[in-house]
């Protein structure tokens, strides 16, 4: 057990929040290279998520958790802006709100059950097994992303 204090845990999320605000310019050149291809953007982000969980699975001290959070945050900056955009592109006319609601509901379910299921894995096995489990889920997400057929139509206009 690494015995991370509540204060240290809070620092991890503070790093995450600050990075989301200030590190956007660091990923802008990569987003430019991806030329607005949301599928590629999500692919890059998921690979970065996997890297963060791999690094963190070997954590023996708080510093490695900080490194893992920094890597994870870069993954977030690629994936999470793309998800509602794709939902909007996939939604039939008049159903955009319903699709956005589904995206938000899925995120909420993840926040509700993720810590519980992660805790079960840690209690039953160990931290490394939990991170391996998360990487397996991300491989599944990559497979789904690879078979996902992009909507090649023009983006929908949102009426004011």
Regions found by a protein language model. Give the residues of each.
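Helix-to-loop junctions at the C-terminal end of transmembrane segments
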Residues: 23-37, 122
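Structural signature of the two symmetry-related core transmembrane helices
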Residues: 40-55, 135
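Loop-to-transmembrane helix entry
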Residues: 3-19
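Helix-loop junctions at membrane interfaces in 12-TM secondary transporters
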Residues: 55-69
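Intracellular juxtamembrane helix-capping segments at the cytosolic ends
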Residues: 78-91
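A membrane-interface helix-boundary motif in multi-pass transporters
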Residues: 120-138
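Loop-to-transmembrane helix entry/capping segments in MFS-fold secondary transporters
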Residues: 6, 93-103
